Amino acid sequence: MMIQERIAGLRKYMAQYGLEQVLMGNPININYFTKMGARRSDRATFLYVTQTEAKILVNDVIGYTTLEGMDVAFHTDGDNVCEAIAMHTIHDKPLAVDGEYPAKWLIPLRDFNAATDYILGDRAINLQRAHKDAEEQQLLREASQMNDRVMKRVRTEVFHDGITEMEASRAISKMFVEEGADMPGWCIVAFAEGSADVHHHPGNAQLKEGDTVLIDMGSPRKGYHSDMTRPFFWKKVSDRQREIYDLVLRANLAGEAAVQPGARCCDVDAAARDLISEPGYGKYFTHRLGHYIGLELHDPGDIIGGNTDPVEPGMAFSCEPGVYLPGEFGVRVEDLVIVKADGTAEILNHDSKELEILGL
């Protein structure tokens, strides 16, 4: 989808929600709609969209002269940025801004009567970003393929008796660059009872026989993120570990299978959550089933009980049920999925999900 098609999609949602003008200051939103490489800076860049125009407002030092189908309006270091922005807005209409629009630019903007009111435009922006076009879908596939390659190496190249969580995490992070990532990967490595901490920080715990080894990892590739979680067991596995692993894996598969035409985000969450709740472990599944993913690791949007939005073609999100037993261990199994044109799930991760005992 080219830039103008993304802008056209935004305009459709603007009309749906009664927004006549939208001003964006979040560089991620700006990059999605322009591909201009905007970044957070004291020389801020803005994107202004109405039903008839799309305009980049940028400091002339940054130097953009043309962008596909868009006007470019420059201001200088000596200009009052908010006054410059106000010159381009419709003053007798509400102005929608994105949720991360910097307050230091928004509050002074009111002094220039740039609009009758200021409202959030995130609903329209986020719905457009949620529907990945063919280019984005391919980039997400490639990022997940990279994650699969790293996880394959992890099984044989990282762990040994006595290695610490931090040492393992650092070793895995380096592998991402070797496999084509934009930067070293992020990696949660948790041993034993640490795996019962949903967002554990790798520390000095040392690997020992019988430990659950939980690995949650990813990195962007060509700007689009990967994310995958796999649990392993070191040298042996108990019956209780095996029971929980089997339960969580079945919940993961149930969530993925629930992606069907007409399904809502809350339905997908319920398919996995109900399976875990049935044998009495529901209170140990303490988080949403998944999050949207794309230019951000956590794109706006959740697969969660309260989200009644329909699951639609082009959406990309994680499916990551877990059971966390305090003081014992935790198990989470996570894949990324894209909703296909027929409304079902394409699983992006092809790394094995069968129970594995490492170190034998």
Which residues fall in each region the model found?
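Active-site neighborhoods and metal-handling regions in enzymes and metal-associated proteins
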Residues: 1-360
